[in-house]
Amino acid sequence: MALNFERSQDYTLIRQIITHPAIWPHVSDDYTPKPEEWKPAENDSVWYVLVYDGGELLGLWTFIPETAICWKVHTCLLPCAWGYRSRIAARQMAEWIFANTACLRIITDVPEYNRHALKFAKDAGMHEFGYNAASYMKNGILHGQHLLGISKETQCQ
């Protein structure tokens, strides 16, 4: 499956994807603004990368550098991408980001209650390296987060 990836600064489209009703509940916490009030960060250091299967938009990844070579990722794939295509897209995304940026390590945080996201991250080749207790508030409940990552040297083997 040949997917296309492109960096975007189309903040209207980015906002539409992230605030999609099937995505927003999974990427927001108790302190995130309401979807109608939320705006994406308009900063050159943040990479919003769209993914297409042919002409069909599957969603995006947001990459936020924590250092020059270690970038945190947030996944926002639309329902049309869920399942097989999402797993393929995630693996190809890692290849693309490593080939097109200075990033050498991708990391993410997954709230402990989100078993689907944890499985998705592991299926994408990420490995758990830690746990951040009591670090995420959702629906008035304090949750811990699994810490996962993948390195260029590991992913490209």
Please identify what each model-predicted range represents.
Residues 83-98, 119:
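Conserved acetyl-CoA-binding loop-helix of GNAT-fold acetyltransferases
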Residues 1-32:
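Short amphipathic alpha-helix that is part of the acyltransferase structural core
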Residues 38-50, 59:
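A short helix-loop-beta-strand connector motif used in the catalytic cores of GNAT acetyltransferases and
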Residues 107-119, 135-136:
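Conserved beta-strand-loop-alpha-helix junction that forms the acyl-donor binding cleft
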Residues 68-80, 109-111:
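Conserved acetyl-CoA binding element of GNAT-fold acetyltransferases
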